[in-house]
Design a protein with these regions (language model features):
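PRPP-associated nucleotide enzymes
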Residues: 1-166
Length: 166
């Protein structure tokens, strides 16, 4: 289990890094729904500067497994040309969702595109993506719930992160 105090500490650390790296700009945060909404809300409250937030929705999971296909359900609806963009994700496993997001953003001429994730599983990565801001690294075999992460829609409301029982 990863407790709420550990999570809070990591969120504050990531927010400080983002604030430092985006000094002098008004960044755009793209929150990937549904999972990242809890992380995004806490992260954004720790960044005391002007910013904009946009929500996108991509889907690649059924139950505990990736389908291997990323579906764009609700896309980018704002102009990010010349802007610093930070994609906020709850968990990065294969990297396919972030690869799709970067492809979507490629034609929008953002000044920079970086990724902030609460959790990554480096051993499961199948793509070459750079995760600039990462809270926790976990084992590939752990399936986790809580703090926005779910199992078939349940568990997002839990304040801590738990490894789901088999």
């Amino acid at each position: 289990m990863t407790g709420r105090n550990e999570i809070r500490h990591e969120v504050k650390r990531l927010a400080a890094e983002i604030e430092r790296d985006t000094e002098g700009s008004t960044p755009v945060f793209l929150c990937v729904l549904n999972g990242a909404f809890v992380f995004a809300a806490d992260l954004l409250r720790c960044i005391p500067k002007d910013c904009e937030v946009c929500f996108v929705r991509l889907a690649s999971y059924e139950g505990t497994s990736s389908t291997g296909t990323v579906k764009n359900i609700m896309g980018l609806n704002m102009d990010v040309k010349g802007r610093d963009v930070i994609i906020i994700e709850d968990i990065i496993e294969t990297g396919r969702t972030m690869q799709t997001m970067k492809k979507i953003l490629a034609g929008h001429e953002a000044k920079s595109v970086n990724i902030a994730t609460l959790v990554s599983k480096p051993a499961k990565l199948e793509t070459d993506i750079n995760i600039r801001y990462c809270g926790f690294k976990m084992k590939a075999t752990d399936f986790i719930v809580g703090y926005g992460l779910d199992y078939n829609g349940l568990g997002r409301n839990l304040p801590d992160i738990y490894i789901a029982a088999d």
